[in-house]
Amino acid sequence: FDGGLTADVRDDRIDPDNAARLIAGADLVLDGTDNFATRLAVSDACVAAGIPLLSAAVGRFQGQVGAFAGHLPEHACYRCFVGDAFDAEDCDTCAEDGVLGAMVGWVGSFAAMQAIRVLLAGASSFGDPQWGQLHLLDGLTPETRSFRIAKDPACQGCGAR
């Protein structure tokens, strides 16, 4: 790994008004927020700034990790995955639903591996960033599934790119 890599960890509330400022200058944004409204704000800011997004989420016994490059014409953004057909402000949060600590560890470790994959992008056999691929982790079964998300040409976040 490059010894010059740095991580800028943010413990700020992020919203549509400050997202662009908080992600400015990043090579990759890792989003671990706990609600759709914030995730969509982060995704939209990443698309606008041309920064890849690695999204990781946990709810109860399930998790998901996905790498999005909606700023590129051929790849989906996070909004392509979730769409706009729901009230992002009216969804449950981790605090309301609860999460299993072991799931957070599993998803966090998986996301760290995906972040390395994105940052190495082609520099090694490990470097396929897997843009638009969503990995679902199920702690009850336990098993994983993966599928690719297509870019939505009508997406409000990246469709015009």
Predicted regions and their residues:
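Adenine nucleotide-associated cytosolic modules
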Residues: 1-161
